[in-house]
A protein has these predicted regions:
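Conserved glycosyltransferase catalytic-site signature
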Residues: 9, 44, 106-110
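Active-site neighborhoods of divalent-metal-dependent phosphate/nucleic-acid chemistry enzymes
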Residues: 79-122
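Conserved beta-strand segments of alpha/beta enzyme cores
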Residues: 39, 78-80, 137-139
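A generic structural signal for short hydrophobic patches within well-formed alpha-helices
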Residues: 12, 47, 131-132
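Short beta-strand segments at enzyme active-site cores
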Residues: 41-43, 126-127
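Short, well-structured N-terminal submotif of metal-dependent ribonuclease cores
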Residues: 1-42, 55-69
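Acidic, PIN/NYN-like endoribonuclease modules and their adjacent C-terminal/linker elements
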Residues: 2, 113-145
Length: 145
């Protein structure tokens, strides 16, 4: 899907933490995604990581606001929250076995890869190079990575 992007934990955290080195760049890209009506995907596993990091890295008020705003966004058609159900979890275990030579790729990242393949998503907002190391043609955003 050409007008779609998957947002990884790094993307959500960087967007919501003004102290992050690439916050302004990610915030600008995010505004463009919204304006262009890009379909934004993420998973329940990614949001689990994201919400945990919000409360570790931001003050409690900021973390609460970020969590509520992000949760609210996923009630709109432009945002798609993909559940990691039993089938996807099983498929991810197979991916883990396929990429034994890449132990640094987290299980959560593998669930994201599975979703990106399932929904034909080529772009991902992340700073994590693992997504390009598996040879599936994923493109990291912002594109200056």
């Amino acid at each position: 899907m050409s007008n779609s992007i998957f947002i990884d934990t790094w993307g959500w955290l960087t967007l919501n933490d003004a102290g992050e080195r690439r916050h302004n760049e990610v915030a600008s890209l995010y505004r463009t995604l919204i304006t262009d009506r890009t379909i934004i995907y993420t998973s329940t596993f990614v949001l689990d990581e994201t919400f945990t990091l919000f409360f570790k890295r931001l003050n409690s008020f900021q973390a609460k606001q970020a969590m509520l705003q992000l949760s609210e966004a996923f009630t709109t058609e432009q945002f798609q929250l993909i559940q990691i159900d039993e089938f996807r979890f099983s498929q991810t275990k197979l991916l883990r076995l396929k990429y034994l030579d890449k132990p640094q790729i987290s299980f959560t990242d593998l669930t994201s890869i599975l979703i990106m393949k399932e929904f034909n998503i080529q772009r991902i907002l992340t700073e994590d190079a693992h997504f390009t190391q598996i040879g599936l043609g994923f493109k990291l955003e912002p594109s200056s990575f």
